[in-house]
Regions:
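Middle-to-C-terminal accessory/interaction subdomains
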Residues: 1-149
C-alpha cells in the first residue's frame, strides 16, 4: 500500500531563489504509487476509504479535517481531480496507449517468468477508473461529513 503511511516525503529549498517552488516552504510529495490504480487487483471497486484511513493514522491531517474551510477546500480539490484529471474515459484512453507500448515487452516477460497478464491488469485498472469518482464522493461524505455534487 502506498499511502498514507508509505512513499511520502516532505521537501523544501533552504534559500529563496525566486522560483515558484524555491521559496523555502515545506511541500508534500507522494511517489511510487502503483497501488493507486489497482494494478495488483487488490481493490477493484475502490471501496477502501484511504481518506478515513489517513485521518485515523495522521493526527495533523485529522486536525486539519476538523476545520470547515480546509474540509471544503479538500473536498473541492478532490472533486476537481475526479472531474478533470481522473476522468474515466480519458484515463482509459491513456492506459490503452500505454498498454499498447508495453504489451510486447510484457509478453517477453511472461515467457521468461511465467506470469504477467497485461490484459487482466488493464481490465482491473479500467474497472477501478470507472468506479473511482463515485467512490471519491462516498469517501468525502463518509470522512468529512460533506455532501458533494
Amino acid at each position: 500500500k502506498d499511502w498514507p503511511d508509505n512513499n511520502v516525503q516532505l521537501w523544501r529549498t533552504r534559500e529563496d531563489d525566486g522560483s515558484d517552488y524555491g521559496d523555502t516552504k515545506w511541500r508534500y510529495m507522494l511517489y511510487d504509487t502503483e497501488y493507486s490504480m489497482n494494478l495488483w487487483g487488490q481493490d477493484n471497486n475502490g471501496n477502501t476509504n484511504r481518506l478515513q484511513e489517513a485521518r485515523n493514522k495522521d493526527a495533523l491531517f485529522d486536525a486539519l479535517c476538523k476545520n470547515d474551510s480546509f474540509k471544503q477546500s479538500l473536498a473541492d480539490t478532490l472533486m476537481d481531480l475526479a472531474d478533470k484529471n481522473f476522468k474515466s474515459a480519458d484515463a482509459a484512453k491513456k492506459l490503452d496507449a500505454m498498454a499498447a507500448v508495453y504489451r510486447p515487452l510484457m509478453e517477453q516477460y511472461k515467457k521468461r517468468f511465467g506470469n504477467g497478464d497485461v490484459d487482466s491488469r488493464v481490465r482491473d485498472m479500467k474497472s477501478f477508473m470507472a468506479n473511482r469518482k463515485s467512490q471519491i464522493k462516498k469517501h468525502i461524505q463518509e470522512s468529512l461529513s460533506i455532501t458533494v455534487k
